[in-house]
Amino acid sequence: MKKVLALITALVLTLAMAVGASASVPDKPSEFAYAYDFDGSVLSSSTKTTIEQYGAALEEATGIQTIAVVVDFLDGEDPADYATDIINSWGVGQSGENNGVVVLLARGDRKIQIGTGTGVDRVMSGAKCGDL
């Protein structure tokens, strides 16, 4: 559990230090990645590489699929709902396990949200995500 929290904390901090799209959830990308920056203006290639490494290590160690998504604005949408919408519409996590995690950065709104599938609660509750 400590390893999971450490990896997710590292992912959150990496994304937060990096400081596009609209409030509607972007279409699911055709190719899987652990980091999505839709207009390419926030995450440097080295930051994306770091996030990819943390995401792969976390999934290998725990089976939990964690992705980072950068958007510009949420246009008033609740960050928790937006992150959950990404989990559900993109199918983040293993089918039937609901063990996906989305680390969402809304750059223009200056918001960071960690959204978790219900299968992640046994490892990391929403309260623990808030502590990060």
Predicted regions and their residues:
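A structural boundary signal for the start of the first folded domain, especially the loop/turn
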Residues: 2-132
